């Protein structure tokens, strides 16, 4: 039976914050079916592809997405009907040209992405392949090391912590399932630690982490390391720390305003702030350590810490190949966060990952703070052998769904599932890359060859 697209249908559903989002169904002539739901961010980069919302305050406080749904059911459906779902590049190119804008503002990135992902899922169903294997069919796969957001602050929580995410990284294990067990034990122990220290943990933030009112940002790290030890693990051996300050959120008039500590820091002072932490704590990754428009500061940050920790660009690069290319040229950061809805198609996502891999940058596949039960990023992380994933804490079913999908994939792959551990964190330095680092060249229907560096 044919793999041509027969039907495309979108609807409005709710995300994990109770806000409307887009869900798309795609049916092929063969009867194969694919469905995808689009996530949404809270702290968003100024150069992200546009998420189209209606703005009518009488409907969902202005957050409804009926126009995006209508765009899928009319303009996009008419344009892609009859196209071969196995030709992902053609599908995405057709929608990009139909939109005609640089940031997908006409049709909406949420409309375009929903169709892009649902089509890929339908194609995988048509070929009767697991989605990760449809994206990349090889013998061995890297399971991603999870960055688990156990203390939430900033835009993700209602507390006085400036920085957005304090994450545990269980990299000192041989399998993903062992790492996940460690993460859950540390997470539950952290609750006991916070309560014993007199903090309220009655609720959790958008990504499932605790959101206590701590006296300083550093207090979050201290609490986490205490929980790691009380759970029976060793910091720097079994569990490491990753940070996402989301510093664009507290960058005002050229200064970094840490209100919880009553500090106003220049770029150089903010870099020194991080450098002191890197010397003191087992930190392996800092995401958006400086503001997205502070490129001069980013250059200094990379020069000072780029050979010591992973420096991830999220708001900095917004999964955009053209912006990433500029960052690579200027020697800024050494890693990119991959968020599907920042760029709006599967093809462009693969292009960004390919470019990053070729430049020696790592890729961290990521969720958004407004998530759904869709598990597509779990498959994406495995398929691309990115080696790292951010999908929240160890609570809230929208986060756990991704972890459970990774457990299923690891079980299915058996001995062909490789957990890279600390080797997933490759920093740009003057040292030669070890000879056992190999390049896996991935040829798929979504994009050009994807190059991913893998250490075994």
UniProtKB/Swiss-Prot annotation:
Which Pfam family, an example, fits this chain? Enolase_C
Superkingdom of origin organism: Bacteria
Subcellular localization, per the record? Answer: Cytoplasm; Secreted; Cell surface
Which class of enzymes does this protein belong to?
lyase
- Positions annotated to bind (2R)-2-phosphoglycerate: 164, 339, 368-369, 390
For biological process, the GO terms are:
glycolytic process
* Entry's EC annotation: 4.2.1.11
GO CC annotation:
cell surface; extracellular region; phosphopyruvate hydratase complex
Catalyzed chemical reaction(s): (2R)-2-phosphoglycerate = phosphoenolpyruvate + H2O
State its cofactor.
Mg(2+)
Q: Which residues form the active site?
A: 207, 339
What UniProt keywords apply to this chain's record, in alphabetical order? Cytoplasm, Glycolysis, Lyase, Magnesium, Metal-binding, Secreted
The UniProt similarity line reads:
Belongs to the enolase family.
| Record text on subunit structure and interactions | Component of the RNA degradosome, a multiprotein complex involved in RNA processing and mRNA degradation.
Q: What is this protein called?
A: Enolase
The species this protein belongs to is Francisella tularensis subsp. novicida (strain U112)
């Amino acid at each position: 039976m044919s793999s041509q697209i027969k039907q495309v249908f979108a609807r409005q559903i709710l995300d994990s914050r109770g806000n409307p989002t887009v869900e798309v169904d795609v049916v092929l002539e063969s009867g194969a079916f694919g469905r995808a739901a689009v996530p949404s961010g809270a702290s968003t980069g100024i150069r992200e592809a546009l998420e189209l919302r209606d703005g009518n305050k009488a409907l969902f406080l202005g957050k409804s997405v009926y126009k995006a749904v209508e765009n899928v059911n009319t303009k996009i459906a008419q344009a892609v009907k009859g196209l071969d779902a196995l030709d992902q590049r053609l599908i995405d190119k057709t929608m990009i040209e139909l939109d005609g804008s640089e940031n997908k503002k006409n049709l909406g990135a949420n409309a375009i992405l929903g169709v892009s992902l649902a089509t890929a899922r339908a194609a995988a169903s048509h070929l009767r392949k697991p989605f990760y294997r449809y994206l990349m069919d090889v013998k061995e796969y890297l399971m991603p090391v999870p960055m688990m957001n156990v203390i939430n602050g900033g835009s993700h929580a209602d507390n006085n912590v400036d920085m957005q995410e304090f994450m545990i990284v269980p990299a000192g294990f041989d399998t993903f399932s062992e790492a996940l067990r460690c993460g859950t034990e540390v997470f539950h122990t952290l609750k006991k630690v916070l309560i014993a220290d007199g903090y309220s943990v009655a609720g959790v933030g958008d990504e499932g982490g605790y959101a206590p009112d701590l006296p300083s940002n550093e207090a979050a790290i201290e609490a986490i390391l205490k929980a790691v030890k009380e759970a029976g693990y060793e910091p720097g051996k079994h569990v490491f720390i990753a940070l996402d300050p989301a510093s664009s959120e507290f960058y005002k008039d050229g200064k970094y305003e840490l209100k919880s500590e009553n500090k106003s820091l220049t770029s150089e002072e903010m870099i020194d702030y991080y450098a002191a932490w890197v010397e003191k704590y087992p930190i392996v990754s800092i995401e958006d350590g400086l503001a997205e428009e502070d490129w001069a500061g980013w250059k200094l940050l990379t020069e000072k810490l780029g050979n010591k920790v992973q420096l991830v660009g999220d708001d900095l690069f917004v999964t955009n190949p053209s912006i990433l290319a500029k960052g690579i040229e200027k020697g800024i950061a050494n890693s990119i966060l991959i968020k599907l809805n920042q760029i709006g198609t599967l093809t462009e996502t693969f292009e960004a990952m390919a470019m990053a891999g070729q430049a020696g940058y790592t890729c961290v596949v990521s969720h958004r703070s407004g998530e759904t039960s869709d598990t597509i990023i779990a498959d994406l992380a495995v398929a691309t052998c990115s080696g790292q994933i951010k999908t929240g804490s160890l609570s809230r079913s929208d986060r756990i769904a991704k972890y459970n999908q990774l457990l299923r994939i690891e079980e299915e792959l058996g001995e062909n599932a490789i957990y890279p551990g600390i080797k997933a964190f490759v920093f740009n330095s003057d040292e030669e890359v070890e000879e056992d680092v190999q390049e896996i060249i991935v040829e798929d229907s979504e994009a050009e060859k994807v190059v991913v560096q893998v250490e075994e």
